[in-house]
Amino acid sequence: MQTGWRVGTLFNIPLFIDNSWFFIVLLITFLRGSDPSRIELVGPAGAWATGFLYALLLFSSVLLHELGHSLVAKAQGIKVNSIKLFLFGGIASIERESKTPGEAFQVAIAGPAVSIALFVLFTLLGRLDGLPQIANIIIGEVAIVNLILALFNLIPGLPLDGGQIFKAAVWKATKSRTTGVRWAAKAGQFVGWGGISLGLISFFASGSFFGLWPALIGLFILRNAGAYNRMNTLQEGLTKLKTSDAAIRDFRVLDANMSLRQFADEYLLEDKTSSPVYFASSDGRYRGMVTIEDLRQVERSEWEHRTLHSIARPLLEIPHISETKPLTDAIRLLEEKQLARLTVLTPADAVAGTLDRGDIVRALAKQLNFPITEAIIQKIKQEGAYPAGLQLGAIVQAIEKA
C-alpha cells in the first residue's frame, strides 16, 4: 500500500510526498534563509522566500529526474505505480524489470540524462544579461545541484542509477540478470559503507552534525543494497527448486473399502491435535483424498455400510500440482486459490506427497542454508501464512514479471 500525501498526477503517474520531505524542505529553507550574505542582499524575508524557492526548484529537479526514468519505462510498456519525493530525494515505483539489459540501461540512464540537461539549461539561463543578482545565485545553485545529482547517481552501486547501469552491463556480459543484480548490490554495499565512513570522519573532524549527512545517505544506500541482495538471493533460490523438493510424505494411505465407521473409530479419534491427510487406495490405485468435511456430510447411520471409496475425491479434482513443476508454480497456486495445502502428483498421477507454506519455507531455507527452526515452520503451517519478511507470493510475482 502506498504511503504519503498524494499531491497530483503527472502523465497518469500518481505523485506522492513523504512526511520526511517536509522536514528536508524546511531544513533547506532555514539554511538558505539564515545565510548572512542572502539577508544582506534581499533582507530577512527575501532570504527565507528565496530559500524556499530554491528548495522547491531542487525537488522539482528531483521530480523531473524520476520522471525521466518513468517515461522511458512507460515507453517499454512497464506500468509506473507512483513517484514519491522523500528525505533523500525521490523514487519511481516501477511495476517490473525491463525485459532486456539494453532496455534496463535505457531506464537507468534516463534520470541522469535529465539532470545533465537541466544543468545545461540552468547554466545557460545564468548567462542571460539583466538578471537580478539573487536570481543568478539561485539559478547557479540549481544548475550545480543538478550536476551533483547526475554524477552522484552514476556511482555504480544499487540502488543508485549507476548501480542499475552496472547491473545491466553485467547482465549483458553474463546473460544472467541475477548475476547482474548480485554484483551491483555488492557494489552498493561497498558504496554505502564508504558513505558511512566519510560521514563519521567528517563529523569528528568538523564537530558539525551536518557532517553526518554522508553517513545517513550511506546508511540508506547500504540498507537498500542489502534488500536488493536478499531479494535476488531468494529469487535465485526459488527458481532452482522443483515442487518435489518441498513435498513431504506426511499422509496416510487407507484401504478404500474400509467402512466410514472403522475410519472414524480408528483414525479420527486417535489424535485430535494434528490434521493428517488421508488417501484411499484399492487394487494398487489411488481412489482419491478423504477429508473430515466430506465424512461429516454423511449421516452417521450410513457409516456402517458406506466405504471410503464412496466419499473419496479423485486426485485430479482436488488442488494438485505435478512434482516436476517449478516450486514457484506451487507458491503462485497456493496464493491465487488461497489454499492451505496442495497434493503433489507423480507423472503417473499417483500421490508423491503434499506441501504447504511451511514445507516451501523449509525447502527454501535448506537450499539457501538459512537457519530456521522447526517451531517457525510449524507456526507457518498453523497460520497458513508466510512470515512478514518473507512474502513468497509477492516474490514469485516479481520473478514472473521480470
Language model segments and positions:
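Small-residue-rich helix-interface/hinge motifs
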Residues: Q2-T29, W48-A104, E141-V145, L149-A169
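Membrane interface segments of multi-pass transport proteins and intramembrane proteases
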Residues: T9, I13, L125-I139, A168-A184
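Alpha-helical transmembrane segments and adjacent TM-loop junctions that form the membrane-embedded core
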Residues: I144-L234, T273
